[in-house]
């Protein structure tokens, strides 16, 4: 009986010992496996996914124009630092502040007229008669473009005629703009070849809704001028531009980039979106700005419209004052309808601002077509 118990005890001890050895082996094997490099493992753990590369920062969008806060004294209506000056009285009725005194009993000589630039390509038999207006088309950079051409009542191949370009607002047809511009009430009707171009899809460059870019519209206008010059006696020294709203903004683009072509520009209720003042040529330009201080569409103080910023009037004016090297002072004179005209001093070329107590429109008071033509027609390029 004792022998049987001894055998049982021996077998039990052997089994326990065998179990302990096997457990110790498995523990050591697991420890070694976890310490082995990944390539030595049977099923290597997947490498951790790399951290996603940070997305590139978007290019900064052009800063929207910062609206100007209206001031009770009206100082927000002119560029910062510009002040009204009181000219010293000048004898003999001269309006030139810098003129030398004229001896008593003598008079100022009449200034010599500037000669018109010679036009050697005059057609003695132009295609359209004086007083007529035609709708014309041309292919330009893959687009069919249209414009109205009006020949002045007093046109003669023997006398060089000024050229006036007129640009309507967004959505305006040339016919519509030529109607409300009322240039037939001015001497331009008798003197000037008037061109009313149509914007592509009735919009002009620099506005966010325009379909033209990178000077396409500027080149279109210069092609029209060259075409007109082939058939008519054009005074290249007296080429002018005027515009309303979006057309006023584009007129400012011409005033900023085409001083080699235009003698003077006039902007009425201009839509001065930010690109209007980008990369302007540093050259003077005779400039008239007329804007309603109560304009609710393109506010005088600047703001945002069509998800784009537009400039305060005083910022656009300030650009012309700088390029004309004005001395940042002005004289103020009253105009019809409670308007005020600011004429700036010391400029290489004439710069004027007419502040009108009205909304976004081509004004009746003051009489916009005559104010515009009286200003433009007195200017020459050289």
Each predicted region: which residue ranges?
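C-terminal catalytic histidine-bearing segment of alpha/beta-hydrolase fold enzymes
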Residues: 286-290, 309-311, 321-382
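Serine-hydrolase catalytic machinery in alpha/beta-hydrolase-like enzymes
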Residues: 134, 138-154, 158-240, 249, ...
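Acidic catalytic loop of the alpha/beta-hydrolase fold
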Residues: 295-298, 361-362
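Short, flexible/disordered intra-domain loops and linkers
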Residues: 300-311
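Active-site nucleophile loop of the alpha/beta-hydrolase fold
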Residues: 199, 266-273, 292-295
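Bacterial N-terminal signal peptides
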Residues: 23-34
